A protein has these predicted regions:
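A contiguous, well-structured "functional interface" segment within a domain
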Residues: 1-6, 63, 67, 71, ...
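Short terminal alpha-helical segments
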Residues: 1-45
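Helix-centric, low-specificity signal for extended rod-like, repetitive segments
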Residues: 2, 7, 16-19, 60-62, ...
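Extended amphipathic alpha-helical scaffold segments
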Residues: 15-23, 43-53, 77-87, 115-118
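Charged, low-complexity interaction regions
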Residues: 21-36, 54-60, 86-96
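Short, solvent-exposed, charged loop/turn and helix-capping segments
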Residues: 45-70
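Amphipathic alpha-helical binding modules
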Residues: 72-124
Length: 124
């Protein structure tokens, strides 16, 4: 049976994997679909961590702070509509694709959310 800590670690690993894929995208025409896919995966895992993981069952108190950062991200950053609007017009414009990718990365790094995820993973 998977413990809460292991479950949380698996979720954080998948978020960080998608984050690293976003960072490594080369901003070629057609990459907007890849950006959208990774962003949706991140959002889904953040929702799972926020809604389904009980911070009182995690042995490290750092998760409570991180969970509030997840909620902040989900409440304040919404890129799906922008990507849907942008895709038909600018999906081949590498500068706009790059800018969208940077905005998503910047949002993920807001309040040191990504950094804190890595720190918590090391402690679990």
């Amino acid at each position: 049976m998977v413990t809460y800590n292991e479950h949380l670690k698996n979720i954080l690993t998948q978020i960080l994997d998608s984050y690293h894929i976003l960072r490594d995208i080369q901003d070629k025409p057609g990459d907007l679909d890849n950006i959208k896919k990774e962003m949706l995966k991140i959002n889904g895992f953040l929702k799972v961590a926020t809604n389904n993981i009980d911070e009182y069952k995690i042995s490290h108190s750092d998760f409570k702070k991180l969970k509030s950062k997840f909620s902040h991200y989900l409440e304040n950053y919404f890129f799906e509509k922008e990507i849907e609007t942008m895709a038909p017009l600018y999906s081949k414009d590498t500068h706009r694709v790059k800018n969208m990718r940077f905005k998503i990365i910047e949002a993920l790094e807001d309040k040191k959310m990504i950094e804190d995820m890595g720190d918590l993973m090391e402690k679990i």
